[in-house]
Amino acid sequence: MLTRKQKELLVEELSAIFEKSSLILFSDYKGLNVEQITKLRRKLREKLANGARYRVIKNSVAYLALKKAGYSVDEIEEVFSGPLAILYVEEGDPIEAIKIIYDFSKETKGLPSFKGLYLDGRFFDAEEVENLSKLPSKEQLLAMVVSGVQGPIRGFVNVLSGTLKSLLYALNAIKDKKSE
């Protein structure tokens, strides 16, 4: 059991983390054993290095830390009932973290169950987790944008090179006629 001073320090630490986090996902870990939680943490570490963490946090501590970090917690009080584990992402792609925990949940028959999440400061309820898990990752989105921009440029280059080739053929034909 934590002393009051330890709880205050933990609230300070977590509020600083939550201020920097692009994703804060709330889940009920009941039904997961230590081995499964360790496996989830390992998967997060493999994909996102140390940018994402999955921690079991006392409801009152999480509530106070989020409130101190500037989140509107009064509207989401149902999140703070029952066992609570929080996945937060300080560095890296938050959508990738959502995909990892969602896929893990499918493997473990719906565990952990989702309570909701904050993504870039906006709250989404538990039903939105599946929709967010289907979004492309940041890398995939960047690749789509690059290929979308690259296509017209490539076409323009082909048109220019085709025009230059036609001009070159015409000039060569004129040169051949004059040399005859």
Curated annotation (Swiss-Prot):
Would the keyword Glycosyltransferase be found if you checked this record's keyword annotation? Answer: no
Q: Which GO terms describe its biological process?
A: translation
What molecular functions are annotated in GO for this chain?
Answer: large ribosomal subunit rRNA binding; structural constituent of ribosome
UniProt KW keywords:
Ribonucleoprotein, Ribosomal protein, RNA-binding, rRNA-binding
Q: Which Cys-Cys disulphide bridges does the record give?
A: none
GO CC annotations, alphabetized? large ribosomal subunit
Which InterPro entries does the entry mention? Ribosomal_uL10, Ribosomal_uL10-like_sf, Ribosomal_uL10_bac, Ribosomal_uL10_bac_type, Ribosomal_uL10_CS_bac
Instruction: Give the domain of life.
Output: Bacteria
A Pfam family per the record: Ribosomal_L10
Keyword Ribonucleoprotein in annotation: yes
Function (record text)? Forms part of the ribosomal stalk, playing a central role in the interaction of the ribosome with GTP-bound translation factors.
Family listed: Belongs to the universal ribosomal protein uL10 family.
Describe its assembly: Part of the ribosomal stalk of the 50S ribosomal subunit. The N-terminus interacts with L11 and the large rRNA to form the base of the stalk. The C-terminus forms an elongated spine to which L12 dimers bind in a sequential fashion forming a multimeric L10(L12)X complex.
Tell me the protein's name.
Large ribosomal subunit protein uL10
